[in-house]
Amino acid sequence: MAQKQIKVTLVRSVIGTKQSHRDTVRGLGLRRINSSRVLVDTPEVRGMIRKVDYLVSVSEA
C-alpha cells in the first residue's frame, strides 16, 4: 500500500522569525517563497508543519 503524501509550500518569508522556525522550514526542504516539496505524511512531518503553520500551506499530493 502506497504511503499518503502531502504537498508543503512556503507562503511567507522566514525573515524575522525564530531561528528554530527557520531551521524547521529548512528541515522540510523549503528554501524560498513558493517552493514546494512532496513529503510522506508521518507524525514527524506533521509536527514540523504544525510548528511553522503560519509560514506554510499544506495540500494533498
Curated annotation (Swiss-Prot):
Pfam families: Ribosomal_L30 (PF00327)
Gene3D superfamilies from the UniProt entry: Ribosomal protein L30, ferredoxin-like fold domain
Keywords, sorted A to Z: Ribonucleoprotein, Ribosomal protein
Biological process terms in GO annotation: translation
Example of a GO MF term: structural constituent of ribosome
GO terms for cellular component: cytosolic large ribosomal subunit
Chain ranges passing through the membrane: none
Homology family: Belongs to the universal ribosomal protein uL30 family.
PANTHER family hit by this protein: LARGE RIBOSOMAL SUBUNIT PROTEIN UL30M (PTHR15892:SF2), MITOCHONDRIAL RIBOSOMAL PROTEIN L30 (PTHR15892)
Subunit description: Part of the 50S ribosomal subunit.
NCBIfam families: rpmD_bact
Name of the molecule in the record: Large ribosomal subunit protein uL30
Lineage: Bacteria, Pseudomonadati, Pseudomonadota, Betaproteobacteria, Burkholderiales
Gene giving rise to this polypeptide: rpmD
